[in-house]
Amino acid sequence: MKKNVFKPIACAAIMLFSLTSVQAQSIKESFSAEGRKNWKSEVTVRGNLGIYASGFAVTGGVRIDEKRTLGLMAGKNVNVYTVTHGYTDVNSFSAALYGRRYFHLGERKIFSFYSDLALGAAFVTDLEGAYWVDPVDGVTKKEDISVDKGDVQFYISWQPGVRVRCYKNLHLFLGPTLSSHCLGVHLGIGF
């Protein structure tokens, strides 16, 4: 019995194309003059705690429709490097562009899954514990780490999670943080 694999592949391709077309049309409508009238502001404050990293961030964006938000993220971060003579804290300020996608559960939209994707850069402001005094000759030496004050580090971050709407537009959210600089969890509040 000969199986025809063309039909399932063609059907899957048509479904994928139509889904992409529907999403593209939805985004196009959101950016139209009529769609921009429905935009709403969205602000969040979040804390990140991870393995060898911690920090906080503030996001400000525009909810272009009920499922999507685009905006800017700014934060203060501390990354910890293990070095020969202990630990070095790398302090930085970061800025990023982000997009958020909501997957609402139920008509009242009290519970939602979300996915944040951010692309940004962190400016290294300070190194703590990077210098030590050699007891033999009394000379101050720098630890062998790959970053220095004034460096810019680019990063990509993905933060999926669960959002719970508490009162009107006040909501809490929690989820993992998967980033090129941090692996951990985040907890925040948004309005």
Question: What is each residue range found by the language model?
Answer:
Residues A24-K76, R100, H186-G190:
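Short glycine/proline- and aromatic-enriched beta-strand/turn motifs that initiate or cap beta-hairpins
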Residues K37-S41, Y52-F56, D89-A95, F111, ...:
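Residues that define the transmembrane beta-barrel architecture of outer-membrane proteins
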